[in-house]
Amino acid sequence: MAKKTLKVTQYKSASGRLEAHKACVRGLGLRRIGHTVEVEDTPSVRGMINKVNYMVKVEEE
């Protein structure tokens, strides 16, 4: 059975944000506005997304 993945897209800049939020964006693998990555659906990834939900858009697959 394939693992569930999430498509995460950054739509706001991380500059000028809290260091912890910048680290979460980096931890998700996002580098710039408009960048999209596919990440595994795990509790730790969900926590990072939840922390920076005002900067990213999420699509479930």
From Swiss-Prot:
It comes from the Bacteria. SUPFAM superfamilies: Ribosomal protein L30p/L7e. The keyword Protease does not apply. Coiled coil: none annotated. One of its GO terms (molecular function) is structural constituent of ribosome. One of its GO terms (biological process) is translation. Keywords: Ribonucleoprotein, Ribosomal protein. One of its GO terms (cellular component) is cytosolic large ribosomal subunit. Pfam families: Ribosomal_L30 (PF00327). NCBIfam families: rpmD_bact (TIGR01308). Part of the 50S ribosomal subunit. Belongs to the universal ribosomal protein uL30 family. This is Large ribosomal subunit protein uL30. The gene is rpmD.
